[in-house]
C-alpha cells in the first residue's frame, strides 16, 4: 500500500464530504479489478464488489485540483464526458471554473488534426471515464497533454497521469466528483472561502433524465392551468352576484311605491280641490 500524501490539514476532507461520498455510492467499485487500481481498493465484499478507499479518493481529488489551479488560463483546461451521466457535470464544471467542455461524442482529430474546425490545443484534459473517453486520452498522449481521469476499479490507466479512484458509473457519484473538484479548484484560486459554504448545491451537477424533466414541465403546466381556471371561476362567481335576473329590471319596486304613498294625507290630485277649479275674471283695466 502506498503511503498517504502529506498535505496541510486545511485540505483534509470534512465529515460532510465523506458522508456525501458515501451517500452517492462513490466507494462502490466493480467486480473486476485492474492491477494498477489495486492500491486504491480497501476490501472486497463477499459478492465480489470491490470497495474503494475514500481516503485515497480525497487525496487524488486535492492533487487534481492543485494541478488544475496551476493552469493560468482556465480555458486551456478541457473537460470531456462521452457518457450521458457526465454531460451535465462537465458543463457545470466549465461554467464555474472557466474550462472548455466537450459533452457528447469526441470528434477524432480534435487534438491532432489542425485542419478540423473543432481543433483545440489544451494544456490539460479531464475525462469522466478512461474507457468511454479512450479516443481523447489517446490523442492527448500524441501531443503530450496531461490527463486526469475518474477511474473505477476496472479502469485502464494507460496514459492517465492522475487517476481519481471513484465510482464512475453512477450519476450521483460522477456529479459529486465533479462538484468537489470544482469547489476545490475555486478554493485554491481564492474565488470562494473555505470558512463559508459554497452556495452551489451538489445536485446541480447530477444527471437528469429528459423524461423526468418533461414530466416536471407537464406538472407545472397543469398546475398553472388549474390556477388560471380557479381564478376565472372566482371572477365569474363575483360577477354573478351583481347580475339582475328579474324580468322587471330597471322598473320601480311596487312595494317601495306603496310604502311611499301610504303616508300621504288628503287629496293626492289637484282636481279635487275646489279652489283650484274657480276661474278668475280677467282684469278689464290696469290701475
Curated annotation (Swiss-Prot):
Disruption phenotype: Deficiency of 40S ribosomal subunit formation, this is likely to be caused by insufficient 18S rRNA stability.
GO molecular function terms noted in the UniProt entry: structural constituent of ribosome
Annotated signal peptide: none
InterPro entries, per the entry: Ribosomal_uS2, Ribosomal_uS2_C, Ribosomal_uS2_CS, Ribosomal_uS2_euk, Ribosomal_uS2_euk/arc, Ribosomal_uS2_flav_dom_sf
GO cellular component annotations of the record: cytosol; cytosolic small ribosomal subunit
Function description: Component of the ribosome, a large ribonucleoprotein complex responsible for the synthesis of proteins in the cell. The small ribosomal subunit (SSU) binds messenger RNAs (mRNAs) and translates the encoded message by selecting cognate aminoacyl-transfer RNA (tRNA) molecules. The large subunit (LSU) contains the ribosomal catalytic site termed the peptidyl transferase center (PTC), which catalyzes the formation of peptide bonds, thereby polymerizing the amino acids delivered by tRNAs into a polypeptide chain.
PANTHER family: 40S RIBOSOMAL PROTEIN SA
Record-given protein name: Small ribosomal subunit protein uS2B
Species name: Schizosaccharomyces pombe (strain 972 / ATCC 24843) (Fission yeast)
Species lineage: Eukaryota, Fungi, Dikarya, Ascomycota, Taphrinomycotina
